[in-house]
Amino acid sequence: MKEHLNALQQLAVDSAEDKKAFDILILDLRNRSDLTDFFMICSGNSNVHVQSIVDAILDKCYQNRNKPLAVEGYSGGIWVVVDLGD
């Protein structure tokens, strides 16, 4: 999977893996949706774990000057959507 990812996707996957996310999946929606090109879906063991995965992804994005457009659902930690824009 990794050989087909762009830099931003790889950053998100690596950040999630560093925080022990599991079931990481990249969905290519370029030919199916006008709303988005890709989804990354992953899982965590708890609300706190999910939040730490998101924190790691956001930290790496900010370090690489990729400011997320939106983050939804973070406070609950059950699900989180992060729009990385690119």
Region roles according to the model:
Residues 41-44:
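Short hydrophobic/aromatic beta-strand micro-patches
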Residues 82-84:
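Active-site beta-strand termini and strand-to-loop segments that position acidic
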Residues 36-38:
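Short amphipathic alpha-helical segments
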Residues 1-34, 47-80:
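Polybasic/polar functional segments that serve as interface/processing modules
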